[in-house]
């Protein structure tokens, strides 16, 4: 979720959205960035949590997933937060992303799309 830019755009477009971030500071920044009035009926939900543990979302419930996971241990997004995959080396990061992909597949409606924005790890 980072600073909530995708959630802000969803709100402006009248879309419902769920933002999840493991870092409480990112959650707080996103909440602040979403404190504006907009003449739409969108519902924006923000939650501190792990993208590999989406137990609070029903199976086949989400229409579109847009995710921008960290780049393994290239950029540290937090200090000492359990489950933060930005703290992991490449091999462990890929293993953790497998769990994220499984949960994304579970919550995504059949025939819908998931966009994963990530850099190539080939040259790392």
Predicted stretch roles:
Residues 1-122:
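Class I S-adenosyl-L-methionine-dependent methyltransferase catalytic core
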């Amino acid at each position: 979720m980072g600073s909530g830019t995708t959630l802000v755009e969803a709100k402006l477009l009248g879309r419902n959205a769920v933002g999840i971030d493991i870092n409480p500071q990112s959650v707080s920044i996103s909440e602040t960035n979403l404190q504006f009035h907009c003449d739409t009926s969108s519902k924006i939900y923000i939650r501190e949590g792990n993208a590999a543990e989406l137990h609070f979302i029903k199976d086949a419930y989400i229409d579109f997933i847009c995710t921008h996971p960290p780049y393994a241990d290239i950029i540290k997004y937090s200090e000492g937060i359990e489950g933060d995959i930005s703290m992991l080396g490449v091999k462990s990061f890929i293993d953790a992303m497998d769990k994220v992909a499984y949960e994304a597949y579970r919550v995504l409606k059949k025939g819908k799309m998931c966009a994963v924005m990530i850099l190539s790890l080939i040259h790392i």
